[in-house]
């Protein structure tokens, strides 16, 4: 297993991994051009695509973004275990840029006692993701969280209706 810093040429492989991961773990992913735009807008100094490969074949990839002394893992894809190698490479990349914190972005919405009591057993929601992230150590820090900014209310309601949700 090797890890390396990816380039824009690696985005098709990253997108294939994202598609497989989204299907396996049942979550929506962005269009390929979204990831390309994110990398283009923030790289080379404030974003990186890191890949874990075996015999030249990408098995996992992560996109990490930095600002100041902080780094955040926002997008990741894998064919199971190589995600650890890609994540560790991303942490080392961020540390080499002077980052003092690395945000793994998202855990189940539960207090720490519940997190500790349930992380080995629970399989629903974000629990498997938490188990993966917990393996790196660190501490849970709560922040406000992410939200979508709606620029066109009518389109947002139509989109929500189409997806079968309430706006």
Describe the residue ranges of each PLM region:
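A structural signal for short, well-ordered beta-strand segments and their strand-loop junctions
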Residues: 4-6, 51, 101-104, 142
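Short secondary-structure transition/capping segments
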Residues: 16-17, 114-117, 153-157
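Generic preference for well-ordered secondary structure
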Residues: 19-22, 36, 86, 116-117, ...
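Hydrophobic alpha-helical segments
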Residues: 24, 114-117, 151, 162
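Acyl-donor binding region in acyl/amide transferases
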Residues: 65-138
